[in-house]
Amino acid sequence: MPNIFHGVALQMTSDGTGVYYKHGINFKQNSKLMGVLGIHLDNKFQNVSGFEAENRNRSIYLDLSAEFKQELLQEMIAGAFRPVITIQGGSIADVSSITGIENLGNWEMKYAVGAGFQFYNLRILNELTLKYDQNPFTKGTMAFQLAMYWK
């Protein structure tokens, strides 16, 4: 029987915040494969450079992706903290572009890579990760993510 787990994550970027639900299975002994469903709330701001002024409105993005997580140095580290690396890929869409069953919105490709560490707090696995998130809507940002997993 596969080892199935669930989790929630809060991701903070320079231009907004995301809330995610993660479910997955243990793929190999030190690897996990997860499905990620979440929303990203983009902040409203004005960006002024020497060439242009850009106004951005608040947007809500729907994120559907898959994530592969590998635990590193499992045999070598003594202690509570375990380093991990993650690779994530999938699709993201602006919720305002979804108008019904005939028009499912403007979906764009996204990817993310990151590194962090895991530790247990009682029976809940906590994870702190720093990611580089690239998609056409947020234009590539660093993200800090706190996730909690349980069985």
Q: Residues of each region from the PLM?
A:
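Short loop/turn motifs that connect adjacent beta-strands in outer-membrane beta-barrel proteins
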Residues: M1-F5, F27-G35, E71-P83, Y120-L125
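Short glycine/proline- and aromatic-enriched beta-strand/turn motifs that initiate or cap beta-hairpins
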Residues: M1-V19, H23
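Acidic surface patches and DE-rich sequence motifs
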Residues: T13, F119, N135
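Outer-membrane beta-barrel translocator/channel fold
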Residues: G16-G18, G24-N26, M34-E71, V84-I98, ...
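Flexible, glycine-rich linker and terminal segments associated
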Residues: I77-T86, A147-K151
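Short glycine-rich, acidic/polar surface loops and turns
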Residues: K110-A115
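Outer-membrane beta-barrel "beta-signal"
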Residues: F117-Y120, K139-K151
